[in-house]
UniProtKB/Swiss-Prot annotation:
The gene is M. Belongs to the betacoronaviruses M protein family. It comes from Human coronavirus HKU1 (isolate N5) (HCoV-HKU1). It is a multi-pass membrane protein. The keyword Membrane applies. Disulfide bonds: none annotated. Its main location: virion. It is found in: Virion membrane; Host Golgi apparatus membrane. Pfam families: CoV_M. PROSITE patterns: COV_M. Component of the viral envelope that plays a central role in virus morphogenesis and assembly via its interactions with other viral proteins. The chain crosses the membrane at residues 21-41, 52-72, 81-101. This is Membrane protein. The lineage of its organism: Viruses, Riboviria, Orthornavirae, Pisuviricota, Pisoniviricetes. One of its GO terms (molecular function) is structural constituent of virion. Residues 1-20, 73-80 are virion surface.
């Protein structure tokens, strides 16, 4: 490799670099930490999307660094470890795409490429399909309507809905299966507010029913 492109640093140069860029690196790491710590769909969809971009970039950056280490290994032991880490990183990156594509085929939603989870909650509200990521494999899901605002597991989906608009079934799509949740309880608090509880009732290997004519996946990334 060209030494002018990849110069050899000594310890003094590395310390000088850290002194000059310490503040900037600290601010960048602080921002990334805050985004990763507080980026949830129930808080801010914009921050959550930034978090997803950061997580998505982690693997390709890791692959680049491990390949770089293969060319600049300190000895044969580090070379062997660098090659091993490179292979592992590439294999995991490929598996991520394979699983994401399989989930996309099942749901038709771009949320399938979410690097944080392979669980996608799907709810049909008056012919409009909402798809959102859920982190855990819940046994129950809670839908709440507050003055026309619809929330599922604390995540706001849309407005202009009533308890009567809630479907009987909600699904959670995974790479291998599609879990069906049946409405088991509904409580009306007042005219425009209430909640419903959906309980997991069936698990099977089938696709989410398509409703493209009703705009199934045209606004899946909206808060």
């Amino acid at each position: 490799m060209n030494e002018s492109i990849f110069p050899h640093w000594n310890s003094d140069q590395a310390i000088t670099f850290l002194k000059e860029w310490n503040f900037s690196l600290g601010v960048i790491l602080l921002l990334i930490t805050i985004i990763l710590q507080f980026g949830y769909t129930s808080r801010s969809m914009f921050v959550y999307l930034i978090k997803m971009i950061i997580l998505w970039l982690m693997w390709p950056l890791t692959i680049i660094l491990t390949i770089f280490n293969c060319f600049y290994a300190l000895n044969n032991v580090f070379l062997g470890l660098s090659i091993l880490f490179t292979i592992i990183s590439i294999v995991i990156w490929i598996l991520y795409f394979v699983n994401s594509i399989r989930l996309f085929i099942r749901t038709g939603s771009w949320w399938s490429f979410n690097p944080e989870t392979n669980n996608l909650m799907c709810i049909d509200m008056k012919g409009k399909m909402y798809v959102r990521p859920v982190i855990e494999d819940y046994h129950t899901l809670t839908a709440t309507v507050i003055r026309g605002h619809l929330y599922i597991q604390g995540v706001k989906l849309g407005t202009g809905y009533t308890l009567a608009d809630l479907p009987v079934y909600v699904t959670v799509a995974k790479v291998q299966v599609l879990c069906t949740y049946k409405r088991a309880f509904l409580d009306k608090l007042d005219v425009n507010s209430g909640f419903a509880v959906f309980v997991k009732s069936k698990v099977g290997n089938y696709r989410l029913p398509s409703s493209k004519s009703s705009g199934m996946d045209t606004a899946l990334l909206r808060a």
